[in-house]
Amino acid sequence: MTYEKPDENFNRANFLIRKAAKGGCDTAVLPEMWNTGFLPKSNFEALLDKDCERVKSQIGSLAKELNINIVAGSVANIRNGKRYNTACVFDRSGRLVLEYDKTNLFYPMDEDRYFTAGNSPCTFTLDGIKCSVIICFDIRFDNPVKAASENSSIVFTVSQWPNVRVNQLEALAKAHAEKYGVYYAVCNSCGTAGETVYGGSSLFCGKDGKIIAKAGEAEEILTADILFD
């Protein structure tokens, strides 16, 4: 992730998704606000993806071309004059199956000054598997964690969690996975945005809360094979 450089980030995402697909991946996941970093402070309005049109066009078409599902992280979005932190999910046909607006905005970094909190459903289906997505700070709150975990076989958590607190993200994912008996797939950003260093350390948790696979702090493609009941 390169801070405030959406063109570079779209190109990088395209490259990494293609590489993952070539390696046999059937579902690719991107982190929170991967296109701009969290939060873009200069030229913010110009960096907004109007109604997620660029994501829908470029990432949706990539899903169709590669015949893979893509949980396309989240982007800064403007819809009907309001700004949201929005996650999009595409199936193998490139069809948009979910558009979810972050429910719990990260007020310590003034996210609530920039975005409107959402209240949309976070569940969807891919390849017949019930899934859900939550965004970063959401993982600390019963809404939407409870609905996501009770109505899914796997919860995708996309985040921009800083390096200094990345152990908290892991602990929360493990606790929720064990409590609800579901898989958690956490995709966390790495790199630097402004003065904040993000921690990477993306991971997969089993239904028992134990880690199946975990990435390091730098950029990498993390894969895991999951067998659903």
Model-derived regions, located:
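Active-site catalytic loop in hydrolytic enzyme cores
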Residues: 51, 78-150, 164-171, 227-228
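Short polar catalytic/cofactor-binding loops
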Residues: 1-5
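Short, acidic/polar
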Residues: 8-19, 139-146
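Short beta->alpha transition motifs characteristic of CBS
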Residues: 36, 88, 100-106, 203, ...
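Cys-nucleophile CN-hydrolase/nitrilase-fold catalytic domain and related Cys-dependent amidase chemistry
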Residues: 6, 15-92, 99, 163-182
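Short beta-strand scaffold segments in enzyme catalytic cores
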Residues: 72-73, 86-89, 122, 202-204, ...
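CN hydrolase (nitrilase-like) catalytic-core segments centered on the catalytic cysteine
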Residues: 51-71, 140-221
